[in-house]
């Protein structure tokens, strides 16, 4: 007599077992990544020189240092004033993107 319960075929059972293992691995990896580092490991971490920034590097990339050093922005120079306003607006846009919206 055959049992009344259904048994899945071996390939289906193997696929389900593999899927279950992958899901468990994924969740265990996410949980371990979300945990803070132990105190002993955190003490060994040191920021590299120049790793922290205050926004000046963005201004340097946009050419602000060269303009100010060369004295290109003179009274009545509309092109320079316009470039400076666009640069400042762009920096404001970059730094306000990370703030929470009401």
From Swiss-Prot:
Sulfation is important for activity and for the binding to a putative membrane receptor. The keyword Signal applies. The keyword DNA-binding does not apply. Residues 34-92, 98-102 form a propeptide. It is found in: Secreted. One of its GO terms (molecular function) is growth factor activity. The modification Sulfotyrosine is found at residues 93, 95. Residues 1-33 form the signal peptide. Its main location: secreted. Keywords: Developmental protein, Differentiation, Growth factor, Secreted, Signal, Sulfation. GO terms for cellular component: extracellular region. Pfam families: PSK. GO terms for biological process: cell differentiation; cell population proliferation. Belongs to the phytosulfokine family. Promotes plant cell differentiation, organogenesis and somatic embryogenesis as well as cell proliferation. This is Phytosulfokines 5. It comes from Oryza sativa subsp. japonica (Rice).
């Amino acid at each position: 007599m055959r049992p009344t319960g259904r048994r899945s075929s071996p390939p289906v059972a193997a696929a389900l077992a593999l899927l279950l293992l992958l899901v468990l691995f994924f969740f265990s990896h996410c949980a371990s990544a979300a945990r803070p580092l132990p105190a002993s490991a955190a003490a060994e971490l040191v920021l590299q020189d120049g790793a922290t920034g205050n926004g000046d590097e963005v201004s340097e990339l946009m050419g602000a240092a060269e303009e100010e050093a060369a004295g290109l922005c003179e009274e009545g120079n509309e092109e320079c004033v316009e470039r400076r306003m666009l640069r400042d607006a762009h920096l404001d846009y970059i730094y306000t993107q990370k703030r929470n919206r009401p």
